[in-house]
């Protein structure tokens, strides 16, 4: 068997020979961030109090600082709607919440990501341990984590693998979701110097670099050679 630790609960499966996964996505993002700063990029973490304009140039204000830009990109994932609402653009962005648990020290029970399609969850060996993920709910940004969904993940994992202890940590992630399952990539309909890149659902990490390249080309008035109309915010006008 490819995965000898799995219980014999299945009749068969599908293997994706060329599928890949990252055992620690955060490490990759840190390396990308380091490269960004080495090339002159600057990072500031601030609470944004206001977004307005000075002769069509976007202006961001915190409690103590004011920044004016030639062009501004809103790429805040599920939190992007807080800014698009301020720009009077009615974008139906929803928060699709997915749940995760870790079993630290049990990552060697499987050698690759495994999805149990009938139960709607999956398991992945990570540096932090065996990660079990699944379930989807439209729960907004403020509602608390659902303990029943965590319990279901743990029970489902134990249906597949023997000897799992109590899990070490649990959390949920926010996926920015739009009704047509396409992201928004392109300029604001109301303000020509504001651009959007959000709404990538479950594929933000996968498509982030591609979207960044597209937005960079648009801001620089370069030809992308792509039909971006399906990704325009105008589709929700």
Question: Which ranges hold each PLM region?
Answer:
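Surface-exposed helix-capping loop/turn segments at secondary-structure junctions
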Residues: 38-42, 89, 161-166, 223-225
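Helical element adjacent to the flavin cofactor pocket in flavoenzyme catalytic cores
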Residues: 9-71
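Hydrophobic/aromatic beta-strand patches that form the interior of the parallel beta-sheet core
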Residues: 44, 73, 195-197
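Dinucleotide-binding Rossmann-like beta1-alpha1 core, especially the glycine-rich loop
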Residues: 1
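Alpha-helical scaffold segments in soluble metabolic enzymes
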Residues: 31, 38, 82, 156, ...
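Active-site substrate-recognition segment that forms the wall
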Residues: 53, 57, 66-193
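C-terminal lid/capping helical subdomain adjacent to the catalytic/cofactor pocket in oxidative enzymes
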Residues: 184, 189-237
């Amino acid at each position: 068997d490819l995965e000898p630790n799995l219980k014999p609960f299945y009749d068969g499966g599908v293997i994706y020979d060329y599928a890949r996964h990252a055992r620690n996505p955060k490490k990759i993002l840190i390396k990308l961030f380091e490269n960004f700063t080495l090339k002159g990029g600057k990072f500031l973490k601030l609470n944004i109090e206001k977004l307005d304009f000075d002769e069509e140039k976007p202006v961001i204000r915190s409690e103590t600082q004011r920044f004016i830009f030639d062009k501004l990109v809103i790429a805040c994932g599920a939190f992007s709607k807080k800014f698009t609402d301020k720009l009077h653009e009615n974008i139906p962005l929803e928060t699709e919440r997915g749940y995760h648990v870790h079993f630290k020290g049990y990552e060697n029970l499987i050698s690759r990501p495994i999805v149990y399609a009938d139960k709607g969850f999956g398991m992945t060996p990570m540096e932090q341990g065996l990660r079990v993920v699944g379930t989807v709910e439209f729960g907004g940004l403020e509602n608390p984590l659902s303990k029943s969904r965590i319990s279901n993940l743990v029970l489902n994992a134990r249906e597949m693998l023997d000897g799992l202890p109590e899990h070490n940590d649990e959390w949920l992630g926010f996926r920015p979701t739009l009704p047509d399952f396409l992201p928004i990539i392109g300029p604001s309909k109301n303000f020509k110097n504001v651009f959007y890149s959000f709404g990538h659902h479950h594929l933000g990490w996968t498509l982030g670099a591609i979207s960044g390249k597209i937005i960079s080309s648009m801001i620089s008035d370069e030809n992308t050679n792509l039909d971006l109309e399906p990704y325009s915010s105008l589709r929700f006008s």
